[in-house]
Every structure is written in structure tokens, then in C-alpha cells.
Amino acid sequence: MIDFSKKLGAKPKEKKINPIEIYSSLDRKTDAGPLRPTQDRVLQDWDANRRKDRNLIVKLHTGEGKTLIGLLMLQSLLNENGEPCLYLCPNDYLVEQTCREAEKFGINVCQFSQLDKYVIPVDFLNGKKILITNIQKLFNGKTLFGINANCVKIGSVVLDDSHACIDSIKSSFSIRIKKDNDLYGQLLQLFYDDLKEQAYGTLISIEQGSSELLQIPYWAWIKKKEEVARLLASQPDDMSVKFAWPLLKDSLEDCQSFITGNGIEISPIYCPIEKFGSFTKAAHRILMSATTQDDSFFIKGFGFTANEVQQPLTDKVQKWSGEKMILFPSLIDEKLSRLSMIKLFSNEKIAVSRFSIVPSFYMSQDYHYEGCVVANKNSLNGIIENIRRGQRNKLNVLVNRYDGVNLPDNDCRILIVDSLPICDNLSDRYEMECREGSEVTILKQVQKIEQGLGRSVRGEKDYSVIIIIGSDLVNFMMNHRTASYFSPQTKKQIEIANELVESLRQEILDSARADALKCVRLQKF
């Protein structure tokens, strides 16, 4: 029989708010050891000096344990004020991975139910558990969290892999209409004369399906914005329009539009993040970031001050985490070309887990011909589970996945980064074509490459070999001007790789000379 008098007389248990103490008290699994030195130092610094900061950037090297740091910060703030705490990931794959990490460390979290994806978990709303979900759940025109004044109040929010999240946020404001959609033809017809006057030859190529790019003249766009609105509003349930239209419908004059033979893109010149009050009005906004990234969007997009961006929370004594060896095969010997490397590492006799990152599905065809596995968002989890079960004979291919995929330890011992990344959207592509070689475009490419290099080494004891193939990427990384924009760690790894190239070239030359001398001696006899 329950004695309710004891329950009524019991004092509420005091909740710890020091993140180090919280971690010590968690019911962790046996393989979850103590905090790493970096995690310990960062959390102590945050608790002592930065926990009152509304806007905070946490900058650490890839594989330093940012996920656990973010979860412990949220748990600390949840224990302190009891307000809803939200942990946002770039994609569903990382949502599942973060939930597994939380379970491993004994942190109480919740997710959207698979049975009812349209109901926000009550444990999150009541401040009992941290909600882990993908960035698209919050940032879209039909968000369950509400837009403008009608939004769910959130106490604290963490953006994990914040630069990958930024790409998703920008995408949420964009309308992308494919050529086979009736809207494509209607919009093309609306601006046909304007495009013809601008570049009639390119327009003809676009009509024939060319990937060439034109921007719709801004004066024509503004003049015809009402006709554009009428066309888009007539298709409210079209999946290319549905989730972005509520965000753009009253500000088309502040948008820009681009057209190719494959589709049309409409995107805002400035992303009105303020529409998402759950994020912009949160008491604490914590962005987890790698040390190599361009942080300009934190200012112009999220409203962070320059001072907040210039003073991130870092580990002042951090060292390199894990071991990477970068190799440039084509610089050692021209016979070690891109296609020869694909053929070599596609050999199923190689019983080592290996992945290749390619910029497009078109370029993945070379792998498909060799029997490799080209992953998509639905198959990636299964591929990694197969690797963990010992099935490591296949080379797996990630298409344009330079971020949002973590491949620690035996998940990936050989990582191939194939060719220079390409732009995800037409506005970035247009900027790159107009400002080729500018610092802005170089930084964007460097950021993508650095993100790709960080997929395979995720911890202090982790290691992998990274193979760089594709002449455009090799030239970009070896060019003194563009190489200067990489992080100090990557620049050092490129320097070591270059020394190795010179050493191996000399060995090959010496070996060839020795063989030639042997032939000469044999000729004498």
C-alpha cells in the first residue's frame, strides 16, 4: 500500500546545474567513460564564465565531442530554469546518432513520434526532456513550432554542426521548380522577353535543356511580382512551393530568381530568420561549430554581434584530435589517375571500410560501373550497420555529403575525396560564376572540403587515410593562394603530403636509374 503522506511531505530533489556534476551523476553505459579533457575544460569555462550569454558559439576541432558538450549545456539550463530545450541536427541520420549518444550517456531526451509526427512531445513542452530533431522541423513555412508571433516558446536551443544547419535553413526559404513542373513553363513565358533581351543565345540553350544559368533581371522581377505571386499561389500543395511560399509570399520584391534548362530557383536576398520566433526569441542560442568555418551568416542571418562571433568558447589548450594522412596519388605518378584509384579501391578483396565523397550523382556513375554502393538518405544507416557487422568489402559512395555524416573508427579507415565540390543552389553558382577566384567563393569551397575531410576521424584515438583525387581538387589544394585559406591543421597535413610526394618521386627516380644501370651492365656481357 502506498503511503501518500510520505510523498506529500517529501521535499523536491535539488537538481544539479553544474554540467560536470550532472555528468558524474548520470546513469551511463559501461562504455561511456569520463569526460575528455577538452570537454571538461570547455564545460568548466562555460559554467564559470559564459552560461549567462544569450548567444554563444562553441568552436572545437572535428571529433572533440561537441555533441556531448551541447547536450550537457542544455541539461544544465533545463535543470536551472525548466524551460523547453531543443537540440537541432542537420538531418535525420544525425538525429538518430545523437539520440544513441544521449542514451549511452544517460541523458533524458525525446523525439517526434513515428506514429504521430505532427504533435510536439509534451515532455519537451513541459521542460522534462530535451527534444532532438532535425533542423527542417523548425525552419519551414509549415513548421509545427509556428511562425511570426504564433510560435512555441523555447528556453534554449543548440544547433549541432551549425554550418550544415545553415545550408538547410537557407534551403527552407527557397522555391525550386523542376522543368517538368507546369510552373516552370509559365514562369519562363512570363519573363521570356526580359531574358531574351539579356542573353538570347543562352536563353535558346536553356530552352534546349542546357545547364547554363541566367538571372531574371531584378527590375523585371519587381515589376511582375504580382503575376509571380498569382502563379505560385495557384499551386499551394505543390511540394516545390508548399513549405517556402508562406515565408516568401509577402516579400517577393526582396527575392531573386535564376533559371537553367533544368529548373527555376526563387530565393530571398536576405533570409528573414525573425519569422521563426521560437529560435530568434530563445533565451539561449548555442551554435556548435568546427574551427575552420566562415561565421558571417551568424551575424547577417542570426543577428549575432561581431563581438559574439569574435569571442567563441574554445579549448585554449586543445591539440589535434585523431590522426589523418592525406595522400595525392596523381602527384606521385600520373598513372595513378582518378579512374585508376576508383578501380583500385573498388576491389572487393580490400577488407577495409572505405567511403568516397563525390560532388554529384553524375560523377558517381564511375563508381557504379565498378560495382560500388552509392548511398542515399534512406540507405546510409543500413550501409553503416552492415560495416559494423563486418561487411567491409564494398567501396561506399556519398553524393554531395560533405557534412552531416559521421564515420568514426572502423566505420571508415579510407576516405576518398573526389573532385572539387559544386554549388548546392543556383544563387551560389551564379555568385561563383560572377566572382570567380574571389575570397568569398574560395572560402565557401574550402569550407566544403574541410567538412569532407572531417567525416572519417571523429575522436582522439581515431585515424584514417584520406585520398585526394580529381585534378581540379588536387590543383585547388596544392595551389599556394587557395591553400592559404585552409585551417592550420589541414595546411600542415597538405605540407606533409607534399613532402611524401617528393620523397616517393625521388625513390621512383632512383629505382628507375638503378634498373637502367643494371640493364647497361647486362649489355656489356
Cite the ranges covered by each PLM segment.
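Conserved coupling segment at the C-terminus of the helicase ATP-binding
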Residues: 41, 51, 55-57, 61, ...
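Conserved Walker A/P-loop ATP-binding site and its immediately adjacent core
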Residues: 64-115, 136-140, 291-297, 357-365
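Structural recognition of the conserved hydrophobic beta-strand(s) that form the central parallel beta-sheet
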Residues: 87, 131-134, 156-159, 284-289, ...
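Conserved helicase motor "Helicase C" RecA-like lobe of SF1/SF2 P-loop NTPases
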Residues: 358-378
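Long, largely alpha-helical accessory region at the distal end of helicase-like NTP-driven motors
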Residues: 459-525
